């Protein structure tokens, strides 16, 4: 597949023509699908006219984080290779960039103060702002495993009491909770396939 980003043009007609050209070229190169994260509603509407459909929705949910000295996890910087391995382990049906491009995404995250928390049952990437942890990605074997990661992060950061977590809408964490958010779109250049339980996040957007 192919990922489009940084789409811009002087007027919708020029941008529409650019999208058509790019998709045609990628199909000739063997791409079975093209994905994109639209910059806004106007661009999303244009992309829908060009055969793209919404996919990869997210859920954003706030949670109180209990204090628990027994919750253990490791804190480290994660390499692009390691993140791809973690995603393959906890959610194989993930659309993601190759490690070389993921390294750029991770570099931006860590220069902005992101921290990785992980153990054998999951991992999360978060920022701290005042008394709240903002998890931009979290994958774990279940709700309790995710709570342990948050509790360990609370002990490290000391002053936090709350967390805001962004997960894939179909993820098995805290099902039924949170506000659904649109994220990515997909256009099939070959035979369509089911992406209702697929995940895409932390792209070059």
Question: Model features per residue range: what roles?
Answer:
Residues 6-29, 36, 142-155:
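Conserved acetyl-CoA-binding loop-helix of GNAT-fold acetyltransferases
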Residues 28-31, 52:
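A structural motif
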Residues 49-137:
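Amide-forming acyltransferase catalytic core, primarily the GNAT-like/NAT-type
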